[in-house]
């Protein structure tokens, strides 16, 4: 899924908070009450008086061939989220709370079995047409019926959308209790029925009609795209938008190669980059503009759950159906050597699908977790109930013999023997060999040492790097053995967990169930996560889910870092307060005084 909604983040709420009935409210929280009152001036992490104007140039690795990111076809461009407005918008300095955007008000009953949104009369599309209830209903139905497969499942519990007045729409929900649904449907981007009705199912190579703070001004497919601020944007005076969307132009340059992209940044061809490679962060930011202060290099702390990045194992493949085989594969990955030699000790090993949050299963299961897990005791590994999950550990020397001996023993126990130096199945004679699919050549330095370790225990492993378009296609139809994936999480997990792990999505092309997880226990726990009535029950259900996934060995976990690594040409102003759960680039502004200092 490439549209992918901005991640929603959630802090600590106790069992004492009840779900309240709301009538014509300005905001809705998952639990508890919104931080900002009805007549608030602006979010605390913005500068209300931020000047408008100027531009910011960004970069992206890869390519694009469509401006329609709502369907499976094509490789969509990034940053389209600011072209299309949604019913609600979130704040990034509090728990999962959504505030009215296109929606003027929100009404829900205590059980949140439905929600009514009142559409602002001033809300309009870029072509001047008002955003109507009919557009909202058409958007939902079209996304579910013709959109990316993700939408069918994400909005699967939305039974109907009904027009109850000229500016009110009611969504009725079905299925198990899901308190998150009013917030989820509030995230939906509203599309113009008039514009999209005969275009929705096709690749789009024109500027789409949106309703957000930016529109597409021009583009060259695969190379560059320029967004311009909509001067008469209908929502510019709303409290949720004050101090945001300050640049007149946002330009994104596409590069096929990360090294070329970095050199372009050094030359000033674009303004801002977020660094994701430890080696570059340590060695590549020592050029003249850094030394003279024209380029700033900063690590910005955040409180965002870091999720799970790793070698995802496609359990649809026969060789990976045995959990013990998958467990053995983890013993062949030498994280400590990788971190020391390649990453300059910048990372921590990831040991949870909800890392860097209180949702991670870091201790033995609680009483509440055991109540959820016990009905599946005969289906689950015993370790889930009596052992804290830990990844294999090495000393960083590169000598992995101890762990490889453990891997070898596990494989023999699973019926995979060594014959003529090759690992084969003793019963069938099938060799244990596979390919690691990559999209970036830079990741070969991680995958190739891993492949060499696997070879030492008789597993023939190839590493193949393909272009971004082919990589996306192969992920969408699960045409891979093992690949590198990063799945982000929020502090309020919900419906998206079905897309990640449910039995239903395991065989649906385009889902993010890359590992092919299909487990009654996982399905049950996902439902418990979604139905959680308070913060405590959410934590228990999510930790239980985390345990089952970890002990299922669906992933060889990688690493994570708890800060943004950014570099930028010193031409921007920033608010004094950073949002806890986002980088907040849309709150920056173009500083004319700083620009003068950069001039020769």
Model-derived features with residue positions:
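Ligand-site clamp/hinge motif
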Residues: 120, 202, 235-285, 327, ...
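Gly/Pro-rich hinge or "lid" segments in bacterial periplasmic/extracellular proteins
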Residues: 63, 83-94, 185-249, 256-260, ...
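Aromatic- and charge-enriched surface segment that lines or borders ligand/interaction sites
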Residues: 46, 50, 71-79, 105-149, ...
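Detector for C-terminal structural segments
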Residues: 22, 60-62, 75-78, 82, ...
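Ligand/substrate-recognition segments at binding pockets and active sites
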Residues: 40, 274, 383-489
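Surface-exposed binding/hinge segments that line
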Residues: 118, 152-197, 201, 211-220, ...
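N-terminal lobe/hinge region of extracytoplasmic solute-binding protein
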Residues: 20-111, 118, 141, 145, ...
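Extracellular/periplasmic solute-recognition and catalytic clefts
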Residues: 160-163, 217-228, 253-317, 324-328, ...
């Amino acid at each position: 899924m490439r549209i992918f909604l901005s991640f929603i983040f959630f802090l600590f709420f106790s069992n004492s908070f009840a779900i309240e009935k709301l009538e014509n409210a300005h905001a809705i929280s998952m639990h508890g009450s919104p931080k900002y009152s009805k007549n608030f001036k602006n979010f605390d992490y913005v500068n209300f008086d931020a000047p408008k104007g100027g531009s910011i140039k960004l970069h992206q690795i890869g390519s694009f061939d469509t401006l329609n990111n709502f369907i499976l076809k094509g490789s969509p461009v990034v940053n389209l989220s600011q072209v299309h407005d949604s019913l609600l918008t979130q704040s990034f300095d509090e728990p999962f709370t959504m505030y009215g955007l296109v929606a003027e008000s929100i009404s829900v009953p205590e059980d949140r079995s439905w929600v009514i949104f009142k559409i602002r009369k001033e809300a309009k599309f870029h072509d001047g047409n008002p955003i109507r209830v009919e557009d909202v209903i058409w958007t939902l139905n079209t996304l579910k019926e013709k959109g990316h497969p993700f939408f069918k499942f994400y909005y699967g519990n939305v039974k109907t959308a009904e027009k109850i007045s000229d500016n009110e729409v009611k969504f009725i929900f079905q299925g198990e209790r899901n308190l998150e649904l009013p917030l989820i449907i509030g995230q939906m981007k509203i599309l113009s029925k008039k514009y999209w009705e005969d275009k929705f199912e096709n690749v789009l190579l024109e500027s789409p009609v949106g309703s957000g703070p930016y529109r597409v001004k021009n583009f060259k497919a695969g190379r560059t795209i320029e967004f311009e601020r909509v001067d008469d944007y209908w929502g510019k005076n709303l409290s949720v938008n004050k101090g945001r969307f300050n640049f007149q132009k946002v330009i994104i340059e596409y590069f096929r190669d990360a090294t070329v992209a970095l050199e372009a940044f050094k030359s000033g061809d674009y303004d801002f980059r977020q660094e994701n490679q430890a080696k570059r962060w340590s060695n590549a930011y020592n050029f003249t503009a850094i030394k003279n202060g024209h380029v700033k290099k900063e690590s910005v702390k955040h409180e965002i759950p870091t999720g799970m990045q790793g070698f995802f194992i496609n359990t649809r493949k026969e060789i990976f159906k045995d959990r013990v085989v998958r467990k053995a594969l983890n013993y062949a990955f030498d994280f400590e050597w990788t971190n020391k030699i390649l990453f300059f000790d910048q990372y921590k090993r990831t040991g949870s699908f909800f890392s860097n949050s209180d949702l991670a299963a870091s201790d033995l299961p609680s009483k509440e977790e055991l109540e959820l897990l016990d009905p599946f005791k005969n289906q689950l590994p015993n370790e889930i109930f009596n052992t804290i999950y830990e990844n294999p550990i090495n000393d960083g020397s590169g000598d992995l013999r101890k762990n490889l001996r453990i891997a070898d023993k596990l494989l023999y126990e699973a019926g995979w023997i060594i014959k003529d130096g090759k690992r084969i199945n003793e019963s069938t004679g099938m060799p244990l060999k596979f390919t690691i699919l990559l999209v970036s050549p830079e990741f070969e330095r991680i995958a190739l040492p891993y492949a060499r370790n696997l070879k030492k225990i008789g597993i023939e492993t190839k590493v193949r790097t393909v272009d971004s378009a082919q990589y996306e296609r192969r992920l969408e139809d699960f045409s891979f053995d093992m690949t590198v994936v990063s799945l982000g999480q929020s502090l309020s997990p919900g419906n998206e967990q079905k897309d990640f792990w449910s039995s239903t999505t395991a065989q649906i092309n385009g889902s993010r169930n890359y590992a092919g997880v299909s487990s009654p226990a996982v399905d049950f726990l996902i439902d418990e996560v979604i139905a959680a009535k308070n913060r405590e029950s959410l934590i228990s259900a999510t930790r239980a889910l985390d345990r089952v996934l970890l002990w299922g060995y669906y992933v060889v976990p990688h690493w994570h870092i708890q800060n943004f690594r950014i570099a930028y040409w010193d031409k921007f102003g920033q608010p004094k307060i950073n949002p806890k759960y986002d980088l907040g680039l849309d709150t920056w502004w173009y500083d004319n005084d700083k620009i003068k200092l950069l001039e020769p």
